[in-house]
Amino acid sequence: MNINKKRIAIVLFNLGGPDSLKSVKPFLFNLFYDKAIINLPNPLRYIIAKLISTTREKKSQKIYSLIGGKSPLLEETEKQKLALAENLKQATNEDFNIFINMRYASPKIEETIKQIKEYNPTEVILLPLYPQFSTTTTGSSVKNFLSNFNINIPVKVVCCYPVEENFIKAHTALIKEKIFDKNSRVLFSAHGLPQKIIDAGDPYSFQVEETVKAVVKELNIKDLDYKVTYQSRVGPVEWLKPNTEDEIEIAGKQNKNIIIVPIAFVSEHVETLVELDIEYKLIADKYKIKYNRTPTLSTNKIFIKSLTSILLKFINKKEDDFLVASSNGERICPDKFSKCLCFTSFPPMRESSK
């Protein structure tokens, strides 16, 4: 037995989703009760989360009924976990186990940490299934994990991987399969955020744009017609622009065919299967233009290779306490993005995320 052999707990973070129509309301409440989503003190945040989850329940249930009455996100993540484990077994001699933590649904933080404690690791690596960092996604999940994790072992956090080589190549390969003529416009659609979150120093839109720049460069298609757009806008506040729906309308009026690339989603879920595939397609159908979408990266071999490569870098990093870095081991965000997780010099373990 090699006493120096590591035991590594790898935690995959994602949003989560309802596993039945009955669980839609509690899922919505958990989402909007997160301080990273609605930054208001209690009891106001609690009241608003209750109000939103109640008023949106029936509409959201109708949406989920279109895809079998539940979110496919956990099942998708389980498949990614298995593919990643298979790759990693071939690449490292270290002992490891992969766990899943969903921020707003099961398996929630208590369940995940219980499983990790039973495994008894020597270190933990946190890997978000959000390629681009935001305080509302990776930031919230990391904070939630660290504020509940009380084992004194090294924790390594993968902040983001917006321009990781194989992540970019995976997208590029899928786009090349879908480009059907020179009259196509590629819309790189990412989940939107309120503009005020970006203005407060969140690097999300910067990282989305860096991803798109890298993909376009890798595509190497002369005079490629493309735009970065944002979807899923809700409420009266100003959101990131341009809006994906609006850009499909514009393309329709210009008789431009559309290729949608879900550039910030790595798993199929309600925003891709309903919003992109059904709701937005209706806009294209109205103008009788061709509408196509690349699949999410899911278990794409090049994408799994990307995640494997990232993990190997972090497995091989010597760290006695706490590490947070992008996939290349450094901070990639300019200093003006003060909410970048890589500015964190110590683990915020005692700061409440609730």
Curated annotation (Swiss-Prot):
The keyword Hydrolase does not apply. Gene3D superfamilies: 3.40.50.1400. It catalyses: heme b + 2 H(+) = protoporphyrin IX + Fe(2+). Fe cation binds at H191, E271. SUPFAM superfamilies: Chelatase. Keywords: Cytoplasm, Heme biosynthesis, Iron, Lyase, Metal-binding, Porphyrin biosynthesis. InterPro entries: Ferrochelatase, Ferrochelatase_AS, Ferrochelatase_C, Ferrochelatase_N. One of its GO terms (molecular function) is metal ion binding. It is found in: Cytoplasm. Pathway: Porphyrin-containing compound metabolism; protoheme biosynthesis; protoheme from protoporphyrin-IX: step 1/1. Its EC number is 4.98.1.1. Pfam families: Ferrochelatase. It is an enzyme of class 4 (lyase). GO terms for cellular component: cytoplasm. Belongs to the ferrochelatase family. Catalyzes the ferrous insertion into protoporphyrin IX. This is Ferrochelatase. The lineage of its organism: Bacteria, Pseudomonadati, Pseudomonadota, Alphaproteobacteria, Rickettsiales. The gene is hemH.
